[in-house]
């Protein structure tokens, strides 16, 4: 199972290297990684997606807490949260199929950020499922390049069930 970990760390040089080193030494893979400033200026939030069972994640959490600059580690996989990812996709789109590519982007509420004679570059923001869905739909046109950020996530203060919100979102 994939787990989403939210890690608060002191914003100092080498922290990410130590965390990556810990994962490498233990033979764990990081499938997605996003790092940025948190609410306090001297703290960064690392959001990572890691495959593993409950025991593996518990062990990783304990190991992360042993690192000097780690403030808080939270497995937010089962916690109601807001998740987003950003993706840029460059798609083959000559004159005959360009309108169809643009229309497909609009269906996914994506933005066209660049158009050339032979390609369209699309910016997609949403949950990881949306990324997979639009890539599947664009595949028939020929995907030239893809660049994705890692997943970012914040716990919902309202405690509203994420699955319930997704079901509402799909109705509109």
From Swiss-Prot:
Q: What class of enzyme is it?
A: transferase
Q: Where is the ACT domain?
A: 4-78
Record text on subunit structure and interactions: Dimer of large and small chains.
What EC number(s) does the entry state?
2.2.1.6
Tell me one Pfam family matched here: ACT_AHAS_ss
The record's listing under CDD domains reads: ACT_AHAS
Spell out the GO cellular component terms annotated for this protein, sorted alphabetically and separated by semicolons.
cytosol
Keywords of the record, alphabetical order, are: Amino-acid biosynthesis, Branched-chain amino acid biosynthesis, Transferase
Q: Report the record's Gene Ontology biological process terms.
A: isoleucine biosynthetic process; L-valine biosynthetic process
Q: Catalytic activity, per the record?
A: 2 pyruvate + H(+) = (2S)-2-acetolactate + CO2
- In its UniProt entry, what is this protein called? Acetolactate synthase small subunit
Family assignment from sequence similarity: Belongs to the acetolactate synthase small subunit family.
Gene3D superfamilies annotated for this entry?
3.30.70.260, ACT-like. Chain A, domain 2
- SUPFAM superfamilies, per the entry: ACT-like
Give GO MF terms, alphabetically: acetolactate synthase activity; acetolactate synthase regulator activity
Q: In which pathway does it act?
A: Amino-acid biosynthesis; L-isoleucine biosynthesis; L-isoleucine from 2-oxobutanoate: step 1/4; Amino-acid biosynthesis; L-valine biosynthesis; L-valine from pyruvate: step 1/4
Q: Does the keyword Amino-acid biosynthesis apply?
A: yes
Question: Is Metal-binding one of the keywords?
Answer: no
